[in-house]
């Protein structure tokens, strides 16, 4: 009895084993022995844990906030973002010796059956892991598309990319307004009371110069905090955005999207973020937006104060007394008398407050902790309207307007949304040209700007002296200045060391005496003067460097001479 049963038992087992072997050879695991499905379960690490140059930028615009990984999708992690909080972002993986990433990472992952729900996103393999990312390339063929956010995009792909970058959903809508914008000169076409409609596929090239949606505002933060500026611009085609900080005596460093420099980051939507702000981070941060139709520059002031100074900086003058107006006209006190700090001073020529290096000599009162305190003390009138950027505003009652562009020196058309604009907003080109550029004093003059900054100008110049202008003679289209020389820093062609106590005669070329540049006036204030030599004569052109002398500037120039910086610049930049 036992033997037959045993044979039947082994016979059945052999059948089961054969079936299992057949299924395995065919690549179909039996249901009872199916492998457990791969689960990501928040495996991986945050981008900034893997590489300090990888940041959780504004792709989610800080809206997908979280506190733990469990609040995110299984393939995501809860990571610190640019806003100082945390948001869900696709996890990253890196190979470790002897390991191939965290447990649960598939060996050969593909995008098959991997869905990206965000509009404008697509699947990509990152270190063997499928992740969703925003499209970074769009076709160049125009197919203008009106979207539910009130904007017109170059084509559908650009609309989807914008939706992805902001983590929102955009839909195509019927175009209600259609303006054909000129570059500069001709006035905008008159519109009827009932605007015509146009198909998004209109082949007519529609261009509009960049315009801001929101007015730039000053921000003041305490040391160690995080601050961000968003240059929210519109234009057709979509403007390219760059950021730069206005630096004293140095070339500005231009930063583009996805650019990291120290504690300053420009995200993929061109949002400027400053982490762990320090006193030296204070200053004017300038956003430049440009497309084929025009260029726009907007200044975003940032003040950084110590914690115990935050309350004190709100008062512009003690006991409520008016700040002496004469102090606002004095040059910044850059002499070195102790600890150097970044402060603000009022620049009457620029009609704005700018940063400088304060050396605690206290020779005048034109130094402030914050931009706001400086403006409250010294800004006697409204900010020059013509120097403001074109501002569309958030509303959608679109109308054609004109604004003065200080970069091109011309009035240009832009789309006004109907609310929250600024003073640089005119109903016609004629009205714009009658009002701009903004008159300063009795003249319509712009600030003189040298062709290069301090160091580059020094290397390009034939002579550099420290001196005071004792006499100035005006002639048609030119002039002569007698300069009492205090010190010769550079002299390649004139032999100034043999001059003795005699003043140096400098010829001023191509001078418009209504708005003279360089701004040379008779004064006891010491100047740094850099110019050219032709036939043994010292000459200054309108773009020559002439600026107030300070211990810091002179120290910088001595350092340039000592380190032979000009030799390096001549070799790599071709200076002569």
From Swiss-Prot:
Ranges of residues in domain BPTI/Kunitz inhibitor: 328-378, 386-436
Record's signal peptide: 1-34
SS bond list: 46-79, 62-83, 66-78, 72-88, 134-164, 138-157, 146-175, 231-287, 328-378, 337-361, 353-374, 386-436, 395-419, 411-432, 445-515, 448-517, 459-566
Gene3D superfamilies: 2.40.50.120, 3.30.60.30, Elafin-like (4.10.75.10), Immunoglobulins (2.60.40.10), Pancreatic trypsin inhibitor Kunitz domain (4.10.410.10)
Pfam families with a match to the protein in the record: I-set (PF07679), Kunitz_BPTI (PF00014), NTR (PF01759), WAP (PF00095)
Domain WAP: residue ranges: 39-92
Site annotation Reactive bond: residues: 140-141
Expression by tissue: Primarily expressed in ovary, testis and brain, but not in liver. In fetal tissues, it is primarily expressed in brain, skeletal muscle, thymus and kidney.
Sorted UniProt keywords: Disulfide bond, Glycoprotein, Immunoglobulin domain, Metalloenzyme inhibitor, Metalloprotease inhibitor, Protease inhibitor, Repeat, Secreted, Serine protease inhibitor, Signal
InterPro entries with a match to the protein in the record: Elafin-like_sf, Ig-like_dom, Ig-like_dom_sf, Ig-like_fold, Ig_I-set, Ig_sub, Ig_sub2, Kazal_dom
Subcellular location: Secreted
Domain Kazal-like: from-to ranges: 126-177
Keyword Secreted assigned: yes
Primary role: Protease-inhibitor that contains multiple distinct protease inhibitor domains. Probably has serine protease- and metalloprotease-inhibitor activity. Inhibits the biological activity of mature myostatin, but not activin.
Protein name: WAP, Kazal, immunoglobulin, Kunitz and NTR domain-containing protein 2
Organism: Homo sapiens (Human)
High-level lineage: Eukaryota, Metazoa, Chordata, Craniata, Vertebrata
Gene that produces this protein: WFIKKN2
């Amino acid at each position: 009895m036992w033997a037959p049963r045993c044979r039947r038992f082994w016979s059945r087992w052999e059948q089961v084993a054969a079936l299992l072997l057949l299924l395995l050879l065919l690549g179909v695991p039996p249901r009872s022995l199916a492998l457990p499905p791969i689960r990501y379960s928040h495996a991986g690490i945050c981008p900034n844990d893997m590489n300090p140059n990888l940041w959780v930028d504004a792709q989610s615009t800080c809206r997908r906030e979280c506190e733990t990984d469990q609040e995110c999708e299984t393939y995501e992690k809860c990571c610190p973002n640019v806003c100082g909080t945390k948001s869900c972002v696709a996890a990253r993986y890196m190979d470790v010796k002897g390991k191939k990433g965290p447990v649960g990472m598939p060996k050969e992952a593909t995008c098959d059956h991997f869905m990206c729900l965000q509009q404008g996103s697509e699947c990509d393999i990152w270190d063997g892991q499928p992740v969703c990312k925003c499209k970074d390339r769009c076709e160049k063929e125009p197919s203008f598309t009106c979207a539910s956010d009130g904007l017109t995009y170059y084509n559908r792909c650009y609309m989807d990319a914008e939706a992805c970058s902001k983590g929102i959903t955009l839909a195509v809508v019927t175009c209600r307004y259609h303006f054909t914008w000129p570059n500069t000169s001709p006035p905008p076409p008159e519109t009827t009371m009932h605007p015509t409609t146009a198909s998004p596929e209109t082949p007519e090239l529609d261009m509009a110069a960049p315009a801001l949606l929101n007015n730039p505002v000053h921000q003041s933060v305490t040391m160690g905090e995080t601050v961000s500026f968003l240059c929210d611009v519109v234009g057709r085609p979509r403007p390219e955005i760059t950021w730069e900080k206005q630096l004293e005596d140095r070339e500005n460093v231009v930063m583009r999207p996805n650019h990291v420099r120290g504690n300053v980051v420009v995200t993929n939507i061109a949002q400027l973020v400053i982490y762990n702000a320090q006193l030296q981070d204070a200053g004017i941060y300038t956003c430049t937006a440009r497309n084929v139709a025009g260029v726009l520059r907007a200044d975003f002031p940032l003040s950084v104060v110590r914690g115990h100074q935050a309350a004190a900086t709100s008062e512009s003058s003690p006991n409520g007394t008016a700040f002496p107006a004469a102090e606002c006209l004095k040059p910044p006190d850059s002499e070195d008398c102790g600890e150097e700090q970044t402060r603000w001073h009022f620049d009457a020529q620029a009609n704005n407050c700018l940063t400088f290096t304060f050396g605690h000599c206290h020779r005048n009162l034109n130094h402030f902790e914050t931009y706001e305190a400086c403006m409250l003390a010294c800004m006697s009138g409204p900010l020059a309207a013509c120097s403001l950027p074109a501002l569309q505003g958030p509303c959608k009652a679109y109308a054609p307007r004109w604004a003065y562009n200080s970069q091109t020196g011309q009035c240009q058309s832009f789309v006004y949304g109907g609310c929250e604009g600024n003073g640089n907003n005119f109903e016609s080109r004629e009205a714009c040209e009658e009002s701009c550029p903004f008159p300063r004093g009795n003249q319509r003059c712009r600030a003189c700007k040298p062709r290069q900054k301090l160091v580059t100008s020094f290397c390009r110049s034939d002579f550099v002296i420290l001196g005071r202008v004792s006499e100035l003679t005006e002639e048609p289209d030119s002039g002569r200045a007698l300069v009492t020389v205090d010190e010769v820093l550079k002299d390649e062609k004139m032999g100034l060391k043999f001059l003795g106590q005699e003043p140096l005669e400098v010829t001023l070329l191509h001078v418009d005496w209504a708005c003279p540049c360089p701004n040379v006036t008779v004064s006891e204030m010491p100047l740094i003067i850099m110019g050219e030599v032709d036939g043994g004569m010292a000459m200054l052109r309108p773009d020559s460097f002439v600026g107030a002398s300070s211990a810091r500037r002179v120290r910088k120039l001595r350092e340039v001479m000592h380190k032979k910086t000009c030799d390096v610049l001549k070799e790599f930049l071709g200076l002569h």
